[in-house]
């Protein structure tokens, strides 16, 4: 517990130092505003953490015999609530902002912001902040920016109509084209009505499903008006687990979906990853932002190609988790067993539908050089719990 508190305090000190150090520079007002957003977010997370553990702290001082039991319960809560990941996710965003600003100022930096260690991320952010301050003490020359070159991988970027800018095909970084007017006629149909956003903006579908597959969706989604926190649902599932003598550590997505069907709560099928984390204490792998961005770029391209090559007469709607499964199965190395656990949290449809999806995916891969086609193997996922 002390380790978590130290991490929160280190992050708070970092934000304060950045705010004070950059306040004198007008060009950093936007950056400071974004930093304050993350600062407020981390303070709220810290408050929530203290609220969760406060009852246990009171019990810890009530008697020596309870202390070990209480400490173990606090450790379990830290794991279940994913505290370290929440801190790390905020710091990843902060370091990305600092690194992006340095690159805009013409300063080359090493891409170190994807580490999952919060204390190393604080150190990285501090070093980036010092570099940012140092650039102000040097003479600033007007530079010609190479808009078509990615700032991080130095590869040629391609135009992305959904993001109104350029996007790197390697890391997924987006370069906004300032002061550019776009022709928006392709966003409207012949009747003058705006087209469905799902066709021209697949990014929002990707982000929705990634959030749910990684169990990052709000816990309030499990609740109802009568049961805001979803406590009743979790209790019902625990009763079924006990009744069927299931091993909690070996629960799968399919197990949870069957149990949800039994209690007539299939509306929570999208929340299976979150439920698994709440029940087992083990959540999906925390994929780095660089990999997620690359996945988003490939996903966007795949959906665009699908609209062109989809078979006529097929009425099945896009099942976006299938695309996410195929993309991560392709871009994650076979020996990366930690990150490849994400495949275990993606539900695949029935055999007939899966065969049709594979056939369609093969057509997409012919125009998608980033992905090499291979048939889906249901037995490919091995449990690493």
Swiss-Prot record:
UniProt-listed Pfam families: A2L_zn_ribbon, Pox_VLTF3
Top-level taxon in the UniProt lineage: Viruses
ZnF locations on chain (C2H2-type): 166-190
InterPro entries: Poxvirus_VLTF3, VLTF-3_Zn_ribbon
An annotated Gene Ontology molecular function: zinc ion binding
Signal peptide: none
Biological processes per GO annotation: regulation of viral transcription
This protein's name: Zinc finger protein B385R
Induction data: Expressed in the late phase of the viral replicative cycle.
Key words of the record: Late protein, Metal-binding, Zinc, Zinc-finger
Family membership noted in the UniProt record: Belongs to the asfivirus B385R family.
């Amino acid at each position: 517990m002390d380790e978590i508190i130290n991490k929160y305090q280190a992050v708070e000190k970092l934000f304060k130092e950045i705010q004070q150090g950059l306040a004198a520079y007008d060009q950093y007002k936007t950056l400071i505003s974004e930093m304050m957003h993350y600062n407020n977010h981390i303070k709220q997370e810290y408050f929530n953490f203290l609220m969760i553990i406060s009852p246990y702290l009171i019990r810890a001082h009530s008697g020596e015999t309870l202390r070990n039991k209480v400490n173990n319960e606090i450790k379990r809560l830290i794991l279940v609530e994913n505290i370290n990941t929440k801190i790390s996710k905020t710091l990843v965003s902060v370091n990305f902002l600092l690194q992006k600003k340095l690159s805009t100022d013409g300063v080359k930096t090493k891409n170190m912001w994807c580490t999952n260690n919060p204390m190393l991320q604080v150190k990285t952010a501090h070093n980036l902040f010092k570099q940012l301050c140092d650039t102000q003490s040097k003479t600033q020359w007007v530079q010609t920016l190479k808009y078509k070159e990615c700032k991080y991988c130095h590869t040629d970027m391609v135009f992305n109509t959904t993001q109104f800018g350029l996007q790197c095909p390697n890391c997924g970084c987006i370069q906004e084209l300032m002061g550019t007017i776009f022709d928006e006629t392709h966003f409207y149909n012949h009747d003058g009505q705006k087209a469905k956003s799902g066709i021209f903006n697949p990014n929002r579908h990707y982000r929705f499903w990634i959030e749910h597959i990684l169990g990052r969706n709000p816990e309030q989604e499990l609740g109802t008006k009568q049961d805001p926190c979803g406590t009743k649902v979790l209790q019902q599932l625990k009763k079924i687990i006990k009744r069927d003598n299931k091993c909690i550590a070996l629960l799968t997505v399919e197990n949870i979906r069957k149990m949800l069907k039994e209690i007539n709560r299939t509306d929570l099928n999208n929340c299976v990853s979150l439920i698994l984390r709440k029940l087992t204490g083990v959540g999906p792998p925390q994929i780095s932002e660089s990999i997620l961005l690359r996945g988003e770029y490939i996903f966007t391209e795949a959906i665009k190609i699908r609209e062109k090559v989809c078979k006529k007469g097929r009425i099945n709607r896009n099942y976006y988790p299938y695309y996410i499964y195929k993309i991560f199965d392709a871009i994650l190395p076979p020996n990366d067993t930690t990150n490849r656990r994400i495949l275990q949290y993606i539900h695949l449809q029935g055999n007939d539908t899966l065969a049709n999806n594979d056939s369609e995916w093969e057509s997409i891969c012919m125009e998608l050089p980033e992905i090499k086609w291979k048939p889906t193997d249901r037995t490919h996922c091995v449990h690493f719990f």
